[in-house]
From Swiss-Prot:
Name used for this protein in its record: Tail fiber assembly protein homolog from lambdoid prophage Fels-1
Organism: Salmonella typhimurium (strain LT2 / SGSC1412 / ATCC 700720)
Pfam short name (any one): Caudo_TAP
UniProt record similarity statement: Belongs to the tfa family.
Record PANTHER family: PROPHAGE TAIL FIBER ASSEMBLY PROTEIN HOMOLOG TFAE-RELATED, PROPHAGE TAIL FIBER ASSEMBLY PROTEIN HOMOLOG TFAE-RELATED-RELATED
Superkingdom of origin organism: Bacteria
Length: 191
């Protein structure tokens, strides 16, 4: 029964509400002076039994309680990206999440098995990207070694040792350029 104001002081049982969500946060007794209403953020209407992973939310307009799923504080994983998500708002879990961690590596969600499985395609693609990056760095490094040696040769001031180094570094650069990044076998760098 909703609260009725009275000309007499009264102590009644109230059910406290969180101010931002109107969720039930606890019960207590409240002293109500004559000709006053209930304190802010509370009701005298008892909430229903609240199952685990739920909260009771009071609707002030209809003066009724509603049960809402509550997964706040849980960590879940997006099944499309594997990214970790922290749940901070009440309500049902978002679509396409699981509480099972992908556990690192290259994984993808198998919706039939409801489990993370190895994603060989992603692993191969990552290895290929890594090899392409290595190839690019090695070619850049070789070109950096070749440039001053080539300058010495072009200017006619190269020593025999510099000419030999230039040939070795050019050969190395050609061999690096020929490396198949899907199955890399890197040549040895000149000394």
């Amino acid at each position: 029964m909703p609260f009725k104001m009275s000309s007499k002081a009264q102590t009644i049982k109230i059910f406290n509400l969180r101010s931002d969500t109107n969720e039930f946060i606890g019960a207590g007794d409240a002293y109500i002076p004559p000709h006053t209403g209930l304190p802010a953020n509370c009701t005298d209407i008892a909430p229903p039994d609240i199952p685990s992973s739920h909260i009771a939310v009071f609707d002030a307009e209809t003066q009724t309680w509603n049960l809402k799923e509550d997964h706040r504080g849980e960590t879940v994983y997006d099944t499309t990206t594997g990214n970790q998500m922290y749940i901070s708002e009440p309500g049902p879990l978002p679509e396409n999440v699981t509480s099972v961690s992908p556990g690192g590596g290259y994984k993808k969600w198998d919706s039939k098995a409801k489990a993370w499985v190895n994603d060989e395609g992603a692993e191969v693609a990552a290895r290929l990207r890594e090899a392409e990056g290595t190839k690019s760095r090695l070619l850049q490094m070789a070109s950096g070694k070749i440039a001053p040696l080539q300058d010495a040769v072009d200017l006619g001031i190269a020593t025999d040792d510099e000419k030999a180094q230039l040939d070795e570094w050019k050969k190395y650069r050609v061999l690096v350029n020929r490396v198949d990044t899907s199955n890399p076998d890197w040549p040895e760098q000149p000394v």
